[in-house]
C-alpha cells in the first residue's frame, strides 16, 4: 500500500495516482453500500429532485479502515496541492468529522462552517477560530450543485481569510457545480466521482451495462429527470 508519507515524498505521476485513487475509493464506497444505484426505483432528494443515485459518505465513519483511508487520502491531497494551508474548515454537518480527522493528521487548526448562523448565543456561522489572512482548505463530503459548499467558502472569505481550495470525498460532476466553482474561483479536488463509481458498479455486476444510459440521462439534467 502507498502510505501518506511515501506519496507526499516521491515523484509519482499525480494523474496515475488520482486515477487509481478514484477506482479504489469507488470500490470501497460500493462495498459498504455508501452508494446506492436504483435506475428503476429512484430516490427523492431533499431538494425534491428524483435520482437513481444516492451517496451517503457518512457511512464511512462506521468502518475504521475506511474512515482512516479517507482521512489519509484527503490529508495527502492537501499536503501535495495546498502545502501553504494554515487551517482546515469542514462544511456542516457531513464534513465535520472528516475535516477534524484531517486537521488532526496534518496538525492544523480546525473550524466548521454552519449552513446558517445559530439563532442563540454568539450566533456564529463559523465555529472555531480563524484569524484574518489565514489560508484555509475546505473539506466537504459530497458535491452536488455546489451551493452549500460555496456558501461556506463565502463565509470564510468574509472572515478575512483566503480559501486555497476544497477537497471533497465525492462529486456527481454536474455541469452546474463546475460552473459555480469556476465562477467562485475555487479549485476543487475529489477522491472519487460519478464516472469512477458507475464504471466500478458495472464491473462488479451491481448494475447492468444497460442501466448506464439511464444514469447518464439523469446526470445531464438532474433537475428535470423523472425516471
Regions found by a protein language model. Give the residues of each.
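PRPP-associated nucleotide enzymes
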Residues: 5-143, 147-227
Amino acid at each position: 500500500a502507498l502510505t501518506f508519507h511515501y506519496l507526499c515524498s516521491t515523484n509519482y505521476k499525480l494523474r496515475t495516482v488520482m486515477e487509481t485513487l478514484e477506482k479504489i475509493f469507488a470500490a470501497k464506497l460500493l462495498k459498504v453500500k455508501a452508494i446506492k444505484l436504483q435506475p428503476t426505483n429512484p430516490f427523492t432528494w431533499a431538494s425534491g429532485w428524483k435520482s437513481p443515485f444516492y451517496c451517503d459518505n457518512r457511512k464511512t465513519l462506521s468502518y475504521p479502515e475506511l474512515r482512516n483511508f479517507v482521512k489519509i487520502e484527503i490529508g495527502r491531497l492537501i499536503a501535495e496541492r495546498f502545502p501553504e494551508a494554515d487551517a482546515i474548515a469542514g462544511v456542516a454537518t457531513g464534513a465535520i468529522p472528516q475535516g477534524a480527522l484531517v486537521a488532526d493528521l496534518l496538525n492544523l487548526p480546525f473550524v466548521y462552517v454552519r449552513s446558517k448562523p445559530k439563532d442563540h448565543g454568539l450566533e456564529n456561522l463559523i465555529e472555531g477560530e480563524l484569524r484574518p489572512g489565514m489560508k484555509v482548505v475546505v473539506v466537504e463530503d459530497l458535491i452536488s450543485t455546489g451551493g452549500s459548499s460555496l456558501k461556506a467558502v463565502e463565509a470564510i472569505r468574509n472572515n478575512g481569510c483566503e480559501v486555497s481550495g476544497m477537497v471533497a470525498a465525492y462529486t456527481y460532476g454536474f455541469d452546474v457545480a463546475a460552473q459555480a466553482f469556476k465562477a467562485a474561483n475555487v479549485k476543487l479536488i475529489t477522491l472519487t466521482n460519478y464516472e469512477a463509481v458507475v464504471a466500478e458498479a458495472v464491473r462488479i455486476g451491481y448494475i447492468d451495462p444497460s442501466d448506464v444510459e439511464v444514469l447518464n440521462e439523469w446526470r445531464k439534467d438532474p433537475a428535470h429527470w423523472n425516471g
